[in-house]
From Swiss-Prot:
Gene Ontology CC, one term: cytoplasm
Gene3D superfamilies per record: Mur ligase, C-terminal domain, Mur-like, catalytic domain, NAD(P)-binding Rossmann-like Domain
Positions bound to ATP: G109, T110, H111, G112, K113, T114, T115
Catalytic activity: UDP-N-acetyl-alpha-D-muramate + L-alanine + ATP = UDP-N-acetyl-alpha-D-muramoyl-L-alanine + ADP + phosphate + H(+)
GO molecular function: ATP binding; UDP-N-acetylmuramate-L-alanine ligase activity
Organism, as annotated: Caldicellulosiruptor bescii (strain ATCC BAA-1888 / DSM 6725 / KCTC 15123 / Z-1320)
The enzyme's E.C. designation: 6.3.2.8
The family this protein is said to belong to: Belongs to the MurCDEF family.
Source superkingdom: Bacteria
Gene expressing this chain: murC
Official protein name in the record: UDP-N-acetylmuramate--L-alanine ligase
Keywords: ATP-binding, Cell cycle, Cell division, Cell shape, Cell wall biogenesis/degradation, Cytoplasm, Ligase, Nucleotide-binding, Peptidoglycan synthesis
GO BP terms: cell division; cell wall organization; peptidoglycan biosynthetic process; regulation of cell shape
Pathway the protein acts in: Cell wall biogenesis; peptidoglycan biosynthesis
Length: 455
């Protein structure tokens, strides 16, 4: 029996891959730095998880898969190298796994991957296509961050960071948008566009590629591709486009039309935000091309309730609404705040935790500009993730920049202090929103506890 060991098994993607292999009958175990809901769930599914990394965990007869987040001197990785074991980085191994599937649907883009992947997975599940789905967040309607199905359809996010998606073997692709991000790896927007072009070129002539025709950077790269291209738009008549778009309290509905101006469906989204119109169009285009009936797609998209940490309403107290969003790029923050302003007539208090020093340094001015949409901003310390601060940047610089352009803001480092301030500051009808890809959502739990004590 093949054996697999996952270094960093608690990660959202690593855990899903581990469970797929376990479901296929393989021996699987792994390690992670700390206990979590994910490690608990893995154990419940029969996977042994070590807490902490130690060379004794590697027995010498397994294939080792590691996440890019671990250090090069990880003792388990070093032990595997000494033993000359087969070793794969996560994306590389996922690319190999894709060869087992007939239709591999890969969703790329700087923004919107998780939601669109979830939408496509949910549509195919509802249509009884029995898909296997890997998604970068917990999705209630999918029962988690993965669905184990047949080998007919695999639906998976395709991230451009460190060119990960170039290790994939897709048959169907989606490019939602291309924006300036991951500039700790990419030199500039042209190098990002070049990476996406290489990804698009991986789609075989027998497959197809769905692209956002309203995105200039996407438009720049789709020339001279040998695969079938399906264009989506909210602005002009393309292969699949949205028409008669209307909005009520941040929630959108629209007709889906083809390039003959025929109405294919009417979608009434149950998740807020104009950006989700594009995500829904992409999901519609993929599912429709795969033969799912329009009425089934319409029903699924209208039922879809979103993924965790994607404009997620977490709770409320005293008429004050609490939202959490994973936005960690200025474009995403603008979309999030614009949507929140439509949801309630009250003020929006944004609690922002920058994600990585490199991103904050590169996009400092853009972050300041995007946060102007909030009525009040609390900035807290940078969530370092994989980085050390060798960039000479701190959250205080963002705070000072916001002050400089006249934004009502505070810099508060401690989550307890943030919660106290937010509970005191917010009034009935207001929205408190945590924004960032780190652990800033923990603030909302503290806020709810303090609100109960206060009331």
């Amino acid at each position: 029996m093949n054996k697999y060991f996952f270094i960093g098994i608690g990660g959202i993607s690593m855990s899903a891959i581990a469970l797929i292999l376990k479901n296929q009958g393989f021996w699987v175990e792994g390690s992670d730095m700390q206990e979590s809901a994910t490690t608990k769930m893995l154990r419940e599914n029969g996977i042994n998880v070590y807490i902490g990394h130690d060379e004794s965990h590697i027995h010498g007869d397994e294939t080792v898969i590691y996440t890019a987040a671990i250090s090069k001197d990880n003792p388990e990785l070093l032990a595997a190298k000494r033993m000359n074991l087969k070793i794969y980085e996560r994306a590389e191994f996922l690319g190999l796994l894709m060869k087992d599937f007939k239709n591999v649907i890969t969703i790329s883009g700087t923004h919107g991957k998780t939601t669109t992947t979830s939408m496509i997975g949910y549509i195919l599940k509802k249509a009884n296509y029995n898909p296997t789905v890997l998604v970068g967040a917990f999705v209630k309607q999918l029962g988690g961050n993965f669905v184990i199905g047949s080998k007919e359809y695999l639906v998976v996010e395709a991230c451009e960071y460190v060119d990960s998606f170039l290790k994939f073997n897709p048959t169907i692709g989606v490019i939602l948008n291309i924006d300036n991000d991951h500039l700790d790896y990419f030199k500039d927007i042209d190098s990002i566009k070049n990476s996406f072009k290489k990804f698009a070129q991986k789609i075989p002539t027998s497959g197809f590629l769905v692209v956002n025709y309203d995105d200039k950077n996407v438009k720049d790269i789709i020339n001279q591709l040998n695969t079938q291209i399906i264009c989506i738009s909210t602005k002009e008549k393309t292969d699949i486009f949205a028409d008669n778009i209307s909005c009520s309290d941040g929630y959108y509905e629209f007709d889906v039309k083809n390039n003959n101006d025929e109405i294919l469906a009417h979608i009434k989204l149950n998740i807020p935000g104009f950006h989700n119109v594009y995500n829904a169009l992409a999901a519609f285009a993929v599912a429709s091309k795969l033969g799912v009936e329009s009425i089934t797609i319409e029903q699924a998209l209208s039922e879809f309730r979103g993924a965790s940490r994607r404009l997620e309403k977490v709770g409320e107290f005293n008429g004050i609404y609490l939202y959490d969003d994973y936005a960690h790029h200025p474009t995403e923050i603008k979309a999030t705040l614009a949507t929140l302003k439509k949801i309630s007539e009250g003020k929006v208090l944004a609690i922002f935790q920058p994600h990585t020093f490199s991103r904050l340094k590169t996009l400092l001015n853009e972050f300041a500009e995007s946060l102007q949409l909030a009525d009040k901003v609390i900035v807290t310390d940078v969530y370092a993730a994989r980085e050390k601060n060798v960039f000479g940047i701190t959250s205080e610089k963002l705070y000072l920049k916001l002050k400089e352009i006249g934004i009502d803001c505070e810099y508060i480092s401690n989550f307890e202090d943030i919660a106290c301030y937010a509970v005191k500051e917010a009034k009935k009808g207001d929205i408190i929103a945590t924004i960032g890809a780190g652990d800033i959502n923990k603030c909302l739990d503290i806020i709810l506890k303090k609100a109960v004590v206060k009331s």
